[in-house]
Amino acid sequence: MDEGGGGEGGSVPEDLSLEEREELLDIRRRKKELIDDIERLKYEIAEVMTEIDNLTSVEESKTTQRNKQIAMGRKKFNMDPKKGIQFLIENDLLQSSPEDVAQFLYKGEGLNKTVIGDYLGERDDFNIKVLQAFVELHEFADLNLVQALRQFLWSFRLPGEAQKIDRMMEAFASRYCLCNPGVFQSTDTCYVLSFAIIMLNTSLHNHNVRDKPTAERFITMNRGINEGGDLPEELLRNLYESIKNEPFKIPEDDGNDLTHTFFNPDREGWLLKLGGGRVKTWKRRWFILTDNCLYYFEYTTDKEPRGIIPLENLSIREVEDPRKPNCFELYNPSHKGQVIKACKTEADGRVVEGNHVVYRISAPSPEEKEEWMKSIKASISRDPFYDMLATRKRRIANKK
């Protein structure tokens, strides 16, 4: 006989009183209820955790999706900057104001610096506003011109196109003069000197350029650019030393940049030059063509040239001379009969203006004459950029 042996929670010992049995059964019932409650709570907690996980994964997927879209926008920008900017704006990843676009380019994360330079140099009204906002993100106060150029030229890569370079360097010069009032008489002075520094950087640190300019030559080449007056020699010397000791760091994206624009039809060799004095004599000189200038030295080992002939505004032509073969001339097609702007060093070390209306030069052979004429023509006409520089210099000269 099973006296009360069944019931909840298994058998009940027979030696318990009725009251004890009921108490035991009640304990077992409550235990079961607690176990059920715990299981229910576990289930509810699991459900809540699943919901939290789902919410987190939704947020994560939104962030992941946003990051993917930003990365896609950067890739599009590097392939086609206008399409890249448009994609980022359409997907609410970038505001459409010039200031926001400029900030995006200034941070430059994942962006090709050559493409940044091309975009900033464009002529569209919006791009010009972006360039202005981009330049305003640079703080040039209390920096000398080399320090400011270092900062500016690291934030993008200067394009090779003359008009783009002009707009960008004009914006730089205006910003520098605004941050440093009183350093230069005008933005034109800052503009011309900035290019002199960029060319100096290439001359000093490009291994293809054998003739390394000295501080004295750098100072000579920049006479009269401060509204017709000279800049302090100490300022120019400090800028020279800064570049000599540490070249510009140029973003390494590709080869189409300003430093490549300036150099390459370089040529050097012995030529005969007809003197410009009253007694016309032929003198053998070592000529170096570089940096849109023709330098001539008495000896190949000389550190300083005997003369410097800037090629801007000049033309070249083949001529016959009864005394020497293989001749050509440099002349100014716009001002016939006018002395060509050039300088030479006298025996006592004084730098004086040249007195040539034309420079007549004789090469050792017909082949070398052809090569020299070809290189000089290439140097004169290879980039409209030099016309822009010449325009700036004329503007400065006219303010005298």
Swiss-Prot record:
Tissue expression as described in the entry? Present in all tissues tested, with highest protein levels in brain and adrenal.
Q: Which InterPro entries match?
A: PH-like_dom_sf, PH_domain, Sec7_C_sf, Sec7_dom, Sec7_dom_sf
Coiled coil ranges = 14-61
Give all residue intervals belonging to the SEC7 domain. Answer: 77-206
Residue ranges, annotated region (C-terminal autoinhibitory region): 392-400
**Where is this protein localized, as stated in its record?**
Cytoplasm, Cytosol; Cell membrane
Kindly indicate whether the keyword RNA-binding belongs to this entry: no
- Extract the PROSITE patterns matched here: PH_DOMAIN, SEC7
Give UniProt keywords alphabetically. Cell membrane, Coiled coil, Cytoplasm, Guanine-nucleotide releasing factor, Lipid-binding, Membrane
Primary place of residence? cytoplasm
Any GO BP annotation: regulation of ARF protein signal transduction
Domain PH span(s) in chain numbering:
265-381
This protein's GO cellular component annotations are: adherens junction; bicellular tight junction; cytoplasm; cytosol; plasma membrane; ruffle
Topological type in the membrane: Peripheral membrane protein
Record-level Gene Ontology MF annotations: guanyl-nucleotide exchange factor activity; phosphatidylinositol-3,4,5-trisphosphate binding
Protein function: Promotes guanine-nucleotide exchange on ARF1. Promotes the activation of ARF factors through replacement of GDP with GTP.
Assembly description: Interacts with TAMALIN.
Q: What is known of its domains?
A: Binds via its PH domain to the inositol head group of phosphatidylinositol 3,4,5-trisphosphate. Autoinhibited by its C-terminal basic region.
Q: Which PANTHER family match?
A: CYTOHESIN-3, GUANYL-NUCLEOTIDE EXCHANGE FACTOR
The protein, known as:
Cytohesin-3
Give the source lineage, highest ranks first.
Answer: Eukaryota, Metazoa, Chordata, Craniata, Vertebrata
